[in-house]
A protein has these predicted regions:
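Short, charged N-terminal helix-start/capping segments
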Residues: 1-20, 139-157, 205
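N-terminal, charged low-complexity regulatory/assembly segments
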Residues: 1-86
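Short terminal or interdomain "cap/linker" segment that borders an active site or interface and mediates
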Residues: 147-176, 180-182, 186, 190-235
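Amphipathic interaction/junction segments at domain boundaries or subunit interfaces
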Residues: 74, 78-80, 85-182
Length: 235
């Protein structure tokens, strides 16, 4: 199979349909563990009420998220509501920990699906070169969708470096008063990439991100065996 024949080649980043059902199960189980069976229903009632309040209070931000797709809008409102209600009950730090654990559990399933890793690894040609091309096409699609602004793409053979200088998630969550939530995508990647990298002979380094205080997101994909020993510094 040719790389370009993959259904997600050149598509923006998003949770594929097959992951969404699994995601709901992960979220439900996490809420049940966190708040207990007796606390689950009141928590959900508050989250639904908070989602309605967010849509009434911030139609401009909801519309901006919706301009990038219905899925983006739904996730923006839902995550903000979950975080606010959990913060009222547990405090902001614990609320973020709760959502981060959900995102990182989902990442174990979403990252292989986003990259169609079984098919990608079996495509004609060098697996790492195909992985680079898949990333370039995906980042270009995200740039066109307005989700990210990609400043530069550098491919020197054994390393693909992509610098992202703006991120809609960071901007939207900051504007609505929940800047912590901009980090969820970063933490999703930290859990998800290790699941797929061996399949495409790659290593991942990202020393800084916008959501975690950097001037840009510095994505680096190396051919396996050529990356610096700095994985522990990934952001």
């Amino acid at each position: 199979m040719k790389l370009e024949e993959l259904s997600r080649y050149g598509q923006p980043l998003g949770f594929p349909r097959e992951v969404q059902t699994r995601q709901l199960g992960i979220v439900f189980n996490a809420m049940r563990r966190e708040f207990g069976l007796l606390g689950l229903v009141p928590f959900l009632v508050r989250v639904l009420a908070e989602q309605r309040r967010i849509r009434r209070a911030h139609p401009d931000l909801v519309a901006e998220a919706g301009g990038m797709g219905r899925e983006v809008e739904t996730e923006f409102v839902m995550l903000t509501a979950l975080f606010r209600v959990a913060s009222d009950l547990r405090g902001r730090e614990e609320a973020y920990r709760f959502l981060r654990e959900i995102f990182q559990a989902v990442a174990l399933h979403s990252m292989p699906a986003i990259y169609q890793i079984d098919q990608l690894a079996a495509c004609d040609g060098d697996p790492f070169d195909n992985f680079k091309r898949f990333n370039i096409a995906m980042f270009e699609a995200m740039n066109e969708a307005g989700t990210w602004t990609t400043e530069s793409v550098e491919d020197d053979g054994d390393r693909l470096r992509i610098k992202v200088t703006s991120c809609a998630n960071v901007e939207l969550f900051t504007a609505i008063g929940c800047p912590e939530l901009g980090r969820l995508g970063c933490d999703h990647d930290l859990a998800g990439y290790p699941v797929i990298l061996d399949r495409v002979d790659a290593e991942f380094r990202r020393p800084c991100t916008l959501a975690k205080g950097g001037q840009y997101c510095d994505f680096n994909f190396y051919r396996r065996g050529t990356a610096p020993p700095t994985e522990h510094l990934n952001r």
